[in-house]
Amino acid sequence: MTHKIAILGASGYTGAELVRLIAEHPNMEIVALSGERKAGQSMAEVFPHLRHLDLPVLCKIDEIDFAGVDLCFCALPHKTSQEVIRALPATLKIVDLSADFRLRDPEAYRTWYGNEHVALEQQAEAVYGLTEFYRDQIRTARLVAGTGCNAATGQYVLRPLIAAGVIDLDEIILDLKCAVSGAGRSLKENLLHAELSEGANAYAVGGTHRHLGEFDQEFSALAGRPVQVQFTPHLIPANRGILATTYVRGDAQTVFQTLAAAYADEPFVHVLPFGETPSTHHVRGSNHCHIGVTGDRIAGRAIVIAALDNLTKGSSGQALQNANLMLGETETTGLTMAPLFP
């Protein structure tokens, strides 16, 4: 069976990544691509690397006949996404890549994103899209909320450790480096080549990054009590990739064994041999996450490092993984490509 797919926001990085991935999916056909400001243009004009594909011309959302769509990916900015999704057919399966449906508490959404939620009915039904931990709910969901790329990386490290009770919940430090594509395709002064190249900088320092809302929600639910992590992201002059270094109080071997057991049967999350550390080079362009564990010279502490591609495993690859489950496909279909190297 061929599933008819629409992608809203196809002129952005995550939208283009979805097109790249779905083009190789044997049971999906892209029937509609929206790009409000680029309507009427071909995808080859907007993204020349997709020139070889036979794709629909970009259109406006209101030009799409959703009666002929089995599943819709929404790769629009937050706030815009909720306004669009609440107007879509109530039976349409949707995977949202924005932040609009990640937080279950409307007040938490207002706190972190600065505006009221206008699609509360859809927010209430949305399933959080961290595939490895919400598979059963995702299979039967109508609306799945993709995670933040930083939030996904941190959770792959910390969820099993919190659930197993093997680390001190009051002493978690997460230091994360993210490539510039995580900021999207819009023109911003700080993302100009001359501003970014040959340098790196911290941002959202002091606990202000919006993905902390996801950490608070997910970790506190796991622990059964409030859990807050100390999280500082850094922007690095790379196109793709996240490298997250997490410092925890706990026995390093126990941390390693807990993570190795948690992901032993996972197709996309891989725990390296003890003492090895991952690189963003080794996951680039793939749906894989690599995790490495090592001890520290300070007794009773462990260092856990995770690497993934922010556009693939951190966003569009995760979205396709979820869509496969929603449509009854094998979870790994269209996602088994090896990482690009060098």
Swiss-Prot record:
Its EC number is 1.2.1.38. Gene3D superfamilies: Dihydrodipicolinate Reductase, domain 2, NAD(P)-binding Rossmann-like Domain. It comes from the Bacteria. GO terms for biological process: L-arginine biosynthetic process. The active site is at C149. It is found in: Cytoplasm. It is an enzyme of class 1 (oxidoreductase). The keyword NADP applies. SUPFAM superfamilies: Glyceraldehyde-3-phosphate dehydrogenase-like, C-terminal domain, NAD(P)-binding Rossmann-fold domains. One of its GO terms (molecular function) is NADP+ binding. Keywords: Amino-acid biosynthesis, Arginine biosynthesis, Cytoplasm, NADP, Oxidoreductase. It catalyses: N-acetyl-L-glutamate 5-semialdehyde + phosphate + NADP(+) = N-acetyl-L-glutamyl 5-phosphate + NADPH + H(+). One of its GO terms (cellular component) is cytoplasm. InterPro entries: AGPR_type-1 (IPR000706), NAD(P)-bd_dom_sf (IPR036291), NAGSA_dehydrogenase (IPR050085), Semialdehyde_DH_NAD-bd (IPR000534). Pathway: Amino-acid biosynthesis; L-arginine biosynthesis; N(2)-acetyl-L-ornithine from L-glutamate: step 3/4. Catalyzes the NADPH-dependent reduction of N-acetyl-5-glutamyl phosphate to yield N-acetyl-L-glutamate 5-semialdehyde. Belongs to the NAGSA dehydrogenase family. Type 1 subfamily. This is N-acetyl-gamma-glutamyl-phosphate reductase. It comes from Ruegeria pomeroyi (strain ATCC 700808 / DSM 15171 / DSS-3) (Silicibacter pomeroyi).
